[in-house]
């Protein structure tokens, strides 16, 4: 509905787009908005969309008036940045409404197909000043992806303030992470939340391949009495990565961290909630690629009612999980 009501612009940036049913529904809306005079830009990662779209996908979008750019196209020659992928997921509508989360624009994310059992993902819809941060993140990547001059002479035209009646207490702060600036923002947010936890710290992540620093922070939190839990998938999308993920279990479990595997299928959500007071949701997996190699984004929430919604979602998810220690699977590389 938000896209259908767009009046000025729609910006969409995703790691993967699949040229199938889920995307076709969105594309129909985008084409209708273009006909109504709305500026539409679509930006996707080339490697993330390999096998999902044809080589002429971007050209077809351009032919119907949708501006399209592809991030870091794959080529057979040497590319020192090949490993740096755009893993962000952002939609901005008129600068008034923004979306981010774990989902890409493909059938499995909408549970139209079920290659790995049920698919669980999460996202955040936001209004107000926070949307401006998503707009800036999108435009920076869009302009960096081309040697041409920026499409906009003045970025401020997309950053105009809009009247907004606050619906939540507290605040939300979107943030972006880049592998090129020497700052590991995603990891620093996670570790900061772990270190501030007093009662509980719960994570959901599709992969668990962490640095010694993060493993140490999780273990210390558990040892000081914090209820530390991590939810991972019960059905893997990549068996090798699943084995590596499970290899990290034992070192955490023996220090008091509880691991849960979601039995209905694959949980692709990336969330953390702490002490009913703060949470984060976005694109950042608890793995080395997300934390060090990819362009990522997330949103930090503090003092918002939605923090409790996230806790309740994690509680419901845990009710459908197997407790790894109880199943005596800690440290096994099945």
Model-based region annotation:
Residues 1-334:
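Charged, low-complexity intrinsically disordered terminal segments
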